[in-house]
Amino acid sequence: MVAKKRTKLRDKVSRLNAKESAVEEEVPYTSVLGEDPKAFLHQSKETKKEKQSLKHSSFLDRLREKSSANDFSGISKSAARRRKRKLRDDLKPKMQDLLTSLENDVEVESESGEEEYHDTVEDNHDPEIMEDAIPQRKVTRLVSSKKLKKHEKPSGSIVIKKNAPNIRNQRGAKQLSKQESERFNKVLTNQTFQQNPFGSLRDIIKMQKY
């Protein structure tokens, strides 16, 4: 029995050694790898820095294109609006330029009238014709806007003041209702209304309310 156990153990050890040697023979260890023939056939990849630099350059190119198309580049929006407003104001006709042009027209007309007067005086010596030939200067009168606003309004028109109460807000509606009630009481106490109600109502409606 003892001899059989020894032989069994020896057989197991020999089998294990044989397996280990077979594995070592199948997978030999190579310290130096051979050259890969496809090592230089891979595609070049862009790094993050290269991508960021490309994006930055394209963004700068777009900005340059916009700046070449627009004269207000590189300034804030409010400054651009101010410049555009100034350009619009410069395009509008100015009062001083209008006055100078009117004065030039008056001078040209007066010079032409004087030439005609001299021509008629040289041709005719009749005093009546000479009096008719005297040129009359055209004078431009400047009227203030206040006088234009004070023109007479037609009957039945309603004049609304700038500081009149507004019916849309609560305070204005309250004030308007108070004014209407006072006006209604005045109409009722009027003698003409008591004698002829419809005629007086018609006259009051035609009157100016404000």
Curated annotation (Swiss-Prot):
Region (Disordered): 1-127
Main localization of the protein described in the UniProt heading: nucleus
GO biological process: maturation of SSU-rRNA from tricistronic rRNA transcript (SSU-rRNA, 5.8S rRNA, LSU-rRNA); ribosomal small subunit export from nucleus
GO MF term list: G-quadruplex DNA binding
Basic and acidic residues: compositionally biased ranges: 10-22, 35-68, 118-127
Gene Ontology cellular-component terms listed: 90S preribosome; nucleolus; preribosome, small subunit precursor; small-subunit processome
Localization terms from the record: Nucleus, Nucleolus
Keyword check for Transmembrane helix: no
Biased composition (Acidic residues): 104-117
Entry superkingdom: Eukaryota
Keyword field: Nucleus, Ribosome biogenesis, rRNA processing
Summary of the function given for this chain in its UniProt record: Involved in ribosome biogenesis. Required for normal pre-rRNA processing in internal transcribed spacer 1 (ITS1). May be involved in the movements of the replication forks.
Assembly and oligomerization: Interacts with the 35S, 23S and 20S pre-rRNAs and with the U3 snoRNA.
Family affiliation: Belongs to the SLX9 family.
Protein name as it appears in the record: Ribosome biogenesis protein SLX9
